[in-house]
């Protein structure tokens, strides 16, 4: 959701927003994931604005423990829990450990987490 933050209707967002360090790491890859100079500049600008606006929630030992529960829930549902999906699950584990809802544009990425994380599709 953070990549779309400036295009979302503020009325659909919570009053307070937190960002995980894992989300910031994902955002940091953006400028390096394109060869288009203009797109790289847009992504770098987005990264710098996010870095200035947020003090990210760390992926700490509580998050690591929560990741085990998140992974088990997803795997038990027969969904992919490794590879590129693992990043989404690390973000979900951070929200789980912090007791915070996870707002996302891609609710299907977080299916099978009922009871662990409140997923809010915006």
Regions found by a protein language model. Give the residues of each.
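Short, well-structured N-terminal submotif of metal-dependent ribonuclease cores
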Residues: 1-48
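Alpha-helix capping/helix-boundary segments
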Residues: 1, 63, 108-109
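Histidine- and aromatic-rich ligand-binding microenvironments
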Residues: 20, 84-85, 106
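Active-site neighborhoods of divalent-metal-dependent phosphate/nucleic-acid chemistry enzymes
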Residues: 31, 55-101
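Acidic, PIN/NYN-like endoribonuclease modules and their adjacent C-terminal/linker elements
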Residues: 92-122
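Generic detector of contiguous secondary-structure segments
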Residues: 7-9, 47-62
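Short, hinge-like loop/turn segments at secondary-structure boundaries
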Residues: 34-38, 75, 120-122
């Amino acid at each position: 959701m953070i990549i779309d933050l400036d295009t979302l209707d503020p009325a659909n967002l919570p009053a307070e927003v937190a960002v995980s360090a894992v989300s910031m790491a994902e955002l940091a890859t953006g400028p390096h994931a394109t060869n288009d100079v203009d797109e790289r500049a847009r992504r770098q600008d987005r990264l710098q604005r996010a870095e200035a606006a947020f003090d990210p929630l760390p992926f700490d030992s509580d998050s690591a423990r929560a990741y085990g529960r998140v992974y088990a829930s997803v795997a038990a549902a027969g969904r992919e829990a490794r590879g590129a999906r693992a990043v989404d699950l690390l973000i979900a584990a951070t929200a789980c450990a912090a007791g915070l809802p996870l707002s996302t544009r891609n609710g299907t990425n977080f299916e099978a987490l009922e009871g662990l994380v409140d997923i809010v599709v915006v």
